[in-house]
Amino acid sequence: MKITKMLLVGLALISFDSFSQKVQKAAFQVVPLGVMGGIDEKNLSAYLVAPSNTNDYICLDAGTINAGIEKAIENKVFRVSASEVLRKYIKGYLISHAHLDHVSGLIINSPADSSKTVYATKRCMEMMENHYFNDQTWANFGDEGPGFHIKRYHFQTLNIGEETVITN
């Protein structure tokens, strides 16, 4: 009986505490541009993330960019052109690994993009510099690596276990 009373009092306190909490709004907004891998080139891994009520997005992976932005416009997520989202809303890219289903949108859209930072680990950055942005497979839109540097993108290497400030 004593345990039952204690449990009831505990549940009442937890319930009261739950009702007294203020409703918290989401701190971030997420816009999926692509959520798959494989053969569907219009739906490859790419997510825009921004603090709520801003247009300051970082793109987490970049498999699909333009097609995903067009889909987001169609779904009324954005009320501006795809070009404006690409050039002004996306402030940088954070690339998890250099498989094409995670970077093809970054590569293909680089001629139309504005200057921004690409963040990746050393191994990932080396793959992008040596195999994609190398002035042979594709123009080097970066500021490092082989060939002529167009310098559209600043390549910033991330150190595992260290915090990195995202610019812009």
Question: Positions of the model-derived regions?
Answer:
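Metallo-beta-lactamase
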Residues: Q24-A27, C124-N168
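Residues at the C-termini of beta-strands that transition into short coil/loop
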Residues: G34, G63, K122, N159
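A residue-level structural signature of the nucleotidyltransferase/glycosyltransferase Rossmann-like core
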Residues: Y57, K116-T117
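Short internal beta-strands
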Residues: T117-M125
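Pre-active-site segment of Zn-dependent metallo-hydrolases
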Residues: I39-A98, S104-P111
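Zn-dependent metallo-beta-lactamase
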Residues: I3-Y57, T64-N66
